Amino acid sequence: MNAERWDCPCLRWSIDLAGVRARDAALDLFIAGLSALKRGDRAGAEHGLADLVALNRNRAPPDPGQERDQVPDILQKELQALLRQAGGAGGAGGVPADAVALMQEATALEDAMPVEFGPPADVKPAHELLGEMLLQAGLFDDAPRSREII
């Protein structure tokens, strides 16, 4: 993702994700949707989002004493927000208010997660993505507050 090679042949590899954790399958779907969006393939991005929504809808409930893994939900909200932003017709600075609201929901979910060791569980931390969206829209006063939490 950080290389921003949205047309990389590796994105077309068929990888068997049967039996992987929901967060790992969600990461794959998020990257597929995001790369499609970055290539200008809105239908492909919407297909990735639909698959991500289906994954989240069909996840088994957590075991007793365990909490639901929020990473797949965060990734879904991030991809939804990016699609809304790409759709244009926004509010302040060109960012649709519903895209910002989705990102605020994603940041709230992320903030409530326990701190993990190692790299972030999601490929694009929600505060970072919200900050980038606000900066791209020219909302310079709002963006630093979003990124301070990273």
Regions picked out by a protein language model, each given a short descriptive name:
Residues 12-23, 53-68, 107-119, 148-150:
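Solenoid-like repeat scaffolds
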